[in-house]
Every structure is written in C-alpha cells, then in structure tokens.
Amino acid sequence: IDVNRRVSEIASLDAVAPHLLPGNTVRYLMPSRYCPSDEFQSFVSAEFGKFSGGERIAAIRDWIHDKIEYVSGSSTGQTTALDTVVQRQGICRDFAHVLICLARASAIPARFASVYAPDVTPQDFHAVAEVFLDGAWHLVDATGMAGADSIARIGVGLDAAEVAFL
C-alpha cells in the first residue's frame, strides 16, 4: 500500500468558524450513539479552554494518551466515550470516540475512521479520529500507535455505529 497524504502538524492548524463550515461537515458536530459530545462541553471548557483549533486537538490527543490506558478487551460494543473517560481504559475504538467527543464539544467537526495501520503491532485494522481543521480532514490517533502518514483509510462515519470495524 502506498499512502500519499500531506500530513500537517495538528497544533499548527486553525479551526473553521462554525458558520463557515462546508455543509457536509456539520453533521460531524452533533452528538452520536458512542459520542455524547453535549455531555462534555463544561469539561472541555475547563480542561482545554486556553487552546483553540489544532492546539486544542493536540492537547486533547495528549490528554487521552496520558489519562486513558490501552487495555485489550476492556470495552464492549456498548461502551461510549463517557464510559471510557470514567473507566480510564479502552481500545483504539474508545480512544477515537473520546477524541471525537471532545472535538465536537469544542465545535470542531470530528468523525470516526476505520483504517489499516501497518505500524500497529501486531498488524491489524485500527480506529482513529479525523478532525476538520484548515478546510480539510486530518487523521489523529490518540493511541499513538500509528502515524497519519502510513494510515490507509477504509471508511468514515459519525462513530463506530456507522462504520464497519474490521
């Protein structure tokens, strides 16, 4: 697989003002089955209020990586982002859901991406988030297992309920 993607440093990217967002991105601001972003607005303001745009996404990514432990088998098909934050453990799907949730609570469109990530050991399918910054979608892996430059995107949706996770 050859991946040809321009990868930008997330922290250097600007958010797009909600009223200037392309119409097809607006749905990715809404709460969804696994990402109850409306329940995180106070938390996001308190924890990440001094950041905006890509700096906020980088801070969220780092917070998730530092505060949530990757534990195989620690979640089920019913685990939401809220469950993951409370339990402080999850798998790649859960890490993606938390990042999506916190981005949406920040008025930054975010979606779930099912991907193939050759850097993941053992090699397997993987789940990451995509955020809409500077007028384009950018892959963000809060687990730190895969770089955006090597990820092959398979499918995207509001959350795992819309995307086959292989």
Task: Give residue ranges: language-model regions.
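Secondary-structure boundary elements
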Residues: V3, A11-S12, P18-G90, V98, ...
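Short, charged, solvent-exposed linker or helix-capping segments at domain edges/interfaces
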Residues: S8-A15, D141
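Solvent-exposed residues in well-ordered beta-strands and their adjoining turns
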Residues: D2-R6, F132
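Hydrophobic/aromatic-rich core segments of domains that either
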Residues: D62, D94-L166
